[in-house]
Amino acid sequence: MSIRYIDEISDLREKKIFMRVDFNVPLDEHQNITEDTRIRAVLPTINYALDYNAKVVLASHLGRPKGERNAKYSMAPAAKRLSRLLGKEVKLAPDCIGDGVSKIIDSMQPGDVVMLENLRFYPGEEKNDDDFAKALADHCDIYVNDAFAVSHRAHASVEAITKFFPIVAAGFLMKNEMSYFEKSMKNPIRPLVAILGGAKVSGKLEVLENLCNKVDKVIIGGGMAFTFLKALGYNVGKSLVEENLLETALNTYNKAREKGIKFYLPVDCVVADQFNPAAETKVTTIQEIPEGWMALDIGPATVTLFSTALQNAKTIVWNGPMGVFEMDAFSRGTFAMVSAVANSYALTIVGGGDTDVAVHRAGEYAKISYISTGGGAFLELLEGKKLPGIKVLEDNGHK
């Protein structure tokens, strides 16, 4: 079965639409939103519904309130920001279920927007509880999921809720996410290059194993590279290594090589005597990492190697930074890779693992073909998994 999208629903006019969005945005200590990409990403879907004078009921979680009310995790800042972006009032409901919410939804006028309070104030959300899902669905006519970033979670507002709606669809953000995933993984223009970074191999091994059936080249940077390098016999000093995964890393490396995949690892790195922005640093080759020092970024020769490997790429998928880019001394490798990816002639898809943050910080946002809003969801798609939120959309898309 295929997913039905909101623009394939024949009659939205004045209907009450329950829209699952992901407004899990970062806040500062004064409850101000510091980055609103996730809110802006669903504006096309909300505006499309409003063009049909629909009544839009938005539902999201924020943070981890652990199944109980906590003012710190209120959706109020998100409702306020959305109101500004839409140029119209977004009413914040006092709860996400209950009589008070039902009254608000029943009294909505065509073109009204209501934001429900944090879904995770109830344990039923993360337990995928049917009763909680039914309570959410009450009083609405159509279900729309436009929260790709939580679609790998079998939660009540993502999965169970679809049982209680006659019409189930996805929004335009979801459409973009699925479209770019298919362009990069299902029908890629080759050569297809995967860049994987970040601290740990453990979160990426399944991704790597799945990618080995699809890609032409793999580039490994970040802390995870040093588990591979140690497995290959290099002395990596105090660099981050997952000792329990050395054998698995070596097997994955050998398997990729057997399949004819070009497998790139760092040839030099920026090392420090301690994990500290003020640490003493120097550039060394991989063969000469001093005892007691740790590698915290890729070096200039590696940047050249990786950039050259990208030159003939037609599709690039990137997840995870090349070093501890939050510290200025170890940010150059990641920013150089952002530049190499942004200035390539390939279709470029970036997702999760702080890679999107690095792209924003480097000011190259506009040159990337697509930046995924999903961290864990993006990774699970790369692993070849069926996401619960996507599966129910496929199963119920044309019921």
From Swiss-Prot:
Residues reported to bind substrate: 22-24, 38, 61-64, 120, 153
Biological processes annotated in GO: gluconeogenesis; glycolytic process
Entry's transmembrane regions: none
Broad class of where this protein is predominantly found: cytoplasm
GO CC terms: cytosol
Location in the cell: Cytoplasm
Annotated GO MF terms: ADP binding; ATP binding; phosphoglycerate kinase activity
Pathway in which the depicted protein is active: Carbohydrate degradation; glycolysis; pyruvate from D-glyceraldehyde 3-phosphate: step 2/5
Superkingdom of origin: Bacteria
EC number(s) stated in the UniProt entry for this protein: 2.7.2.3
Alphabetized UniProt keyword annotations: ATP-binding, Cytoplasm, Glycolysis, Kinase, Nucleotide-binding, Transferase
Sequence positions that bind ATP: 204, 326, 352-355
Reaction(s) catalysed by this chain's protein: (2R)-3-phosphoglycerate + ATP = (2R)-3-phospho-glyceroyl phosphate + ADP
Subunit record text: Monomer.
Protein's recorded name: Phosphoglycerate kinase
Taxonomic lineage from the root: Bacteria, Pseudomonadati, Thermodesulfobacteriota, Desulfuromonadia, Geobacterales
